[in-house]
């Protein structure tokens, strides 16, 4: 059985990392000639119970474990050999671009254009969907792709068209306002959505977010810091949507672990120095400083930290996994939570080989959503809440994930340390979730 360069996420976190995992999921891709196969085993367990701006998206995906062997699909409660769906022709004509020839129709809503011009992000996500169809999902689903024109009205119109053509599940859109509009159409039709927004406020029962959410990053880094003996914190955050959500999540995460937050210093553009002085005044009372800032602003923030003499342990989120941050002298030794990059690197290699271009970071979201739809489509209760919120979750190269009943998700992230201008894993991503 040949092994391929993609592998799933790292070993389970130890109890010292403050997390315990069980109910191991198993999703595998394999190669047989030009065809990729998937095996998804959801181990026996009880069924489980802001897009901040169009420029500040946190992408992520699950580019999956590979193994060269024949495979099938096993789901809890599935009847082996049960017919997946009536013939596609029973639903009438498809809409938009159509990929695959499976009996189950799935709609995909992407921002293929914006202000009348082609969208590179949308094009990359569409290409990734094609990869998924060709590698696995095309035999179980027919994928209908519509352009929402990066607008709420376009998203609603796309949803109506795809549902009218027999779609049982909608994938996308990307931007929060567009998700809200499309979700209202899907909810009225009683069909679920798996959307790509990073705005957790658009999630709801039946509208699931596949993206990496700020809550996931914050929970992971706080839990890790506490497990390493950090008992009190300070926060230095920008006055923007990302900062607002991150600060709120940090308070919740720290509160659950009885870790006091001594000060929260907010700052506007170019005003990091004043916030750093606030933190510096209490630096002797805190063990770590959390800074949820984007990579392009971190050089000025780092300079403010240096001038204020702040040397406490720095904590961040996945937006720090950027060369502009990794090379900053003041950030050496900092910790941040992020998906392991091995999965995206392997996906990128294959994407480049096929399309001769670099994928957008969000491309793995559409790729994984299509593959997940293809796997679930082979079972009688394919897109039910029970199937989508299975407590065991799904396992991929970027880490395990599962959908919560409220539409948000839980993902397994690694913790990185910045050392010698590079990010090194100091706490591997978990391979599985605790049951419950």
PLM regions: where:
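N-terminal secretory signal peptides
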Residues: 1-68
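Bacterial signal peptide processing site
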Residues: 70-73
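Beta-alpha junction/loop-to-helix N-cap segments that form part of ligand/metal-binding clefts
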Residues: 123-124, 135, 139-201
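Periplasmic-binding protein-like
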Residues: 162-174, 194-196, 234-237, 285-298, ...
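Short beta-strand elements at the ligand-binding edges of bilobed clamshell
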Residues: 192-194, 201-223, 237, 264, ...
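An alpha-beta-alpha
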Residues: 209-266
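Extracellular/periplasmic periplasmic-binding protein-like sensory domains
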Residues: 298-367, 380
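Segments of small-molecule ligand-sensing domains
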Residues: 355-425, 436
